[in-house]
């Protein structure tokens, strides 16, 4: 099993798909990495040579992935909250950040409905 950026890639998948298991690498980035490393997208992870793995590792090191990317994102959110911006307030309250309406939807961000218990008529 190839280990790149601290992630074990599944052996049976094509390398272009296997790279997307790394947080921060999507399909387009995976294709770009393989093109720069001069490795075919159709090779299975189990068929990679050590030289090809090293080339891919060197290319992935040029990108912000896994723990570093997670840390950067969380620090950005924390910064928005500290400066008191509108987006920071929305993050703090657990509401949608990008201008969506919340009258009816936004259940994913707001969580389960909380019924008003014990309310008499």
From Swiss-Prot:
Record region (Disordered): 89-121
GO BP annotations of the record are: translation
Give the domain of life. Bacteria
Listed under GO cellular component are: cytosol; small ribosomal subunit
Q: Keyword annotations for this protein?
A: Ribonucleoprotein, Ribosomal protein, RNA-binding, rRNA-binding, tRNA-binding
Cited function: Located at the top of the head of the 30S subunit, it contacts several helices of the 16S rRNA. In the 70S ribosome it contacts the 23S rRNA (bridge B1a) and protein L5 of the 50S subunit (bridge B1b), connecting the 2 subunits; these bridges are implicated in subunit movement. Contacts the tRNAs in the A and P-sites.
Question: Which HAMAP family does the entry mention?
Answer: Ribosomal_uS13
Self-association state and partner proteins as the record states: Part of the 30S ribosomal subunit. Forms a loose heterodimer with protein S19. Forms two bridges to the 50S subunit in the 70S ribosome.
PANTHER family (alphabetical)? 30S RIBOSOMAL PROTEIN S13/40S RIBOSOMAL PROTEIN S18 (PTHR10871), SMALL RIBOSOMAL SUBUNIT PROTEIN US13M (PTHR10871:SF1)
**Mind telling me what this protein is named?**
Small ribosomal subunit protein uS13
Q: Can you name the source organism? A: Pediococcus pentosaceus (strain ATCC 25745 / CCUG 21536 / LMG 10740 / 183-1w)
Q: Which gene encodes it?
A: rpsM
């Amino acid at each position: 099993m190839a280990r790149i950026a601290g992630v074990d890639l599944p052996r049976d998948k094509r390398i272009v798909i296997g790279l997307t298991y790394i947080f921060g690498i999507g399909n387009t980035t995976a294709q770009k990495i393989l093109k720069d490393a001069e490795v075919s997208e159709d090779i299975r992870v189990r068929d990679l040579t050590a030289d090809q793995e090293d080339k891919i590792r060197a290319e992935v090191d040029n990108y912000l992935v896994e723990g570093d990317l997670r840390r950067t994102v969380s620090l950005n959110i924390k910064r928005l909250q500290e400066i008191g911006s509108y987006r920071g307030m929305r993050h703090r309250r657990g509401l949608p950040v990008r201008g969506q309406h919340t009258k009816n939807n936004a259940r994913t961000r707001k969580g389960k409905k909380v019924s008003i218990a014990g309310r008499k008529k």
